[in-house]
Amino acid sequence: IPSSLVGSEMCIRDRATVVSTDHTGPAGQETLDLEALCRDMGVPVVIGNCVTYDVALQLMRAGAAGVMVGIGPGAACTSRGVLGVGIPQATAVADCAAARADYEKESGRYVPIVADGGIVTGGDICKCIACGADAVMIGSPIARAEEAPGRGFHWGMATPSPVLPRGTRINVGNTGSIERILRGPAKLDDGTHNLLGCLKTSMGTLGAQTIKEMQQVEVVVAPSLLTEGKVYQKAQHLGMGK
């Protein structure tokens, strides 16, 4: 999206339902006026990415219809090494969710947040929702689909930058159809198949009937959760021991 709205007219003409400012670069242009963009665009504008309470609150006050959360956790992203910038995704989502709650009290407007990056398994999706996300954006899990145009490879949006690449091209392979990855039935035991089934089962286990209720479940930091009692899986490189 350029600093003016001229270049975005084509998007509106082609009936775009959402416009995102994700991964914009100045390229010698004037600073983008986010408030004017959100006000004048005519369609919902999703802004990102951010990882802190203060920035998320500023974006919401600028008129964002949604906020993307995550810097560096993506499977192909190298931003944390290149820029030294980033916050663990669970913390980032929780902090931005706190900003959303305060902004809703302030304005009466609820702004959805989308966890973007670091999501590989159904468990990752569940944890993002539990930390406060309304939705997730996934790359590498979908790149593993037989229908994906990358044919088993995945790369981030900043990877091909001619000035400062902040990503790499990784081989994620093909593990099944998009239907199997999203809805099952799963043929893998590591949580990378039937992602929606993972979320539904987790919500049922926690007694959450809606996403809103899932956002209210208790969250604890428990590193041993992934290793406790998994001696045989770890030794045999199965399931959670891979």
Model-derived segments and spans:
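Alpha/beta catalytic cores of nucleotide-metabolism and tRNA/nucleoside-modifying enzymes
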Residues: 41-42, 55, 62, 84-115, ...
